[in-house]
Amino acid sequence: MLDIQLLRKDAALVAERLAARGFAFDAARFDALEAERKTIQTRTQDAQSRRNTLSKQIGMLKGKGEDTTAVMAEVGGLGDELKQLETRLSELQAELNDFLMGIPNLPHESVAPGKDETANVEVSRWGTPRQFDFAVRDHVDLGEGLGQLDFAAAVKITGSRFSVMRGGLARLHRALAQFMLDLHTTEHGYTEVYVPYVVNAESMRGTGQLPKFEEDLFHVPRSDADRLYLIPTAEVPVTNLVRDEIVAAEALPLKFVAHTPCFRSEAGSYGRDTRGMIRQHQFDKVELVQMVRPEDSYAALEGLAAHAETVLQRLGLPYRKMALCSGDMGFSAAKTYDLEVWLPAQNTYREISSCSNFEAFQARRMQARFREGQGKPELLHTLNGSGLAVGRTLVAILENYQNADGSITVPEALRPWMGGVERLTPA
């Protein structure tokens, strides 16, 4: 959520910066709400002041033994008026809050302008794509050829965009998550957390999934007032660990890592990536989350992205780092790097991690703050990134480490988590 004081101070500048990310700020709506709020607030304060004056007058009249009937009648009328004014003021505050909830974050000054992914800026590349001396197969053919990836079974059990893995492939999937967790906890200083996979609406609002992205979420059928949601990312429960909290400054930065399944309806991606594991309703991800002082957040973003890059480097997977333009960033982000891994069968790079700094946008929604000594609480800055998406990493390994006979070489970095297995072969 944006700081409403920033809007009150310079709504035109905010509108200009939001336009850079393709968002049309409704200045007329904001001005109308603000004008009525100011009017009602002034009338409320005047009525309260008048009531206080009359209350003192009643005391003086009683002290003199004089009649207070008329004054008390006026006080009673003011009480009714105040009740109405305070009710309307509460309604206006709620309307303003809802209005603010629908506004995305402002892009950082370093973010390139642009409408979509075509304006994203390549920052760096690592690794050289392998040259194959045989016909490259995609991960679906490879997994099914191993007899260890079964989409038909998933369709029978649930429906499309799910998968079933067996044997060595299922073990490789598990090994990837364990490798990532151990790397981030032992070398990068993260604390592993286990969190609920089902969260309430307040948690979704805190990180920015609600109200804008309701259709992208799976929810548990209950009353609308008590609706629960399957998490689309561990970002939601992990970041909400600091909701309504005041963290001691000396405890910062907070760095958490969690491995969870993620659930997304993919409502806006009809017809995209319908084959295979690239875009599924359920997938595993290792998520990195940090809460830091405001002045440290952009250095933290560089570090967080580097932690995700280390996973790809240890696995020997070629990738590129992209700085997203203003129009391609997520709703809550002020700046985002995407890491895109090379997929030989598609002959292109595909997103495998998204690392973002949200500045105080999420913290303001959650009232997540820190305190320096006895000072006034300040809003934290929050960051997160995939470290990595497990399923897409598995896809990248299948395609980059495939052999002519259909077997898959297990990357050396994963072999300790695979019991020393060096190759997956057809069952």
From Swiss-Prot:
Pathway: Aminoacyl-tRNA biosynthesis; selenocysteinyl-tRNA(Sec) biosynthesis; L-seryl-tRNA(Sec) from L-serine and tRNA(Sec): step 1/1. The keyword Cytoplasm applies. ATP binds at residues 264-266, 351-354. GO terms for biological process: selenocysteine biosynthetic process; seryl-tRNA aminoacylation. Catalyzes the attachment of serine to tRNA(Ser). Is also able to aminoacylate tRNA(Sec) with serine, to form the misacylated tRNA L-seryl-tRNA(Sec), which will be further converted into selenocysteinyl-tRNA(Sec). This is Serine--tRNA ligase. One of its GO terms (molecular function) is serine-tRNA ligase activity. Its EC number is 6.1.1.11. The gene is serS. The keyword ATP-binding applies. Homodimer. The tRNA molecule binds across the dimer. The lineage of its organism: Bacteria, Pseudomonadati, Pseudomonadota, Betaproteobacteria, Nitrosomonadales. It is found in: Cytoplasm. SUPFAM superfamilies: Class II aaRS and biotin synthetases, tRNA-binding arm. Keywords: Aminoacyl-tRNA synthetase, ATP-binding, Cytoplasm, Ligase, Nucleotide-binding, Protein biosynthesis. It is an enzyme of class 6 (ligase). Belongs to the class-II aminoacyl-tRNA synthetase family. Type-1 seryl-tRNA synthetase subfamily.
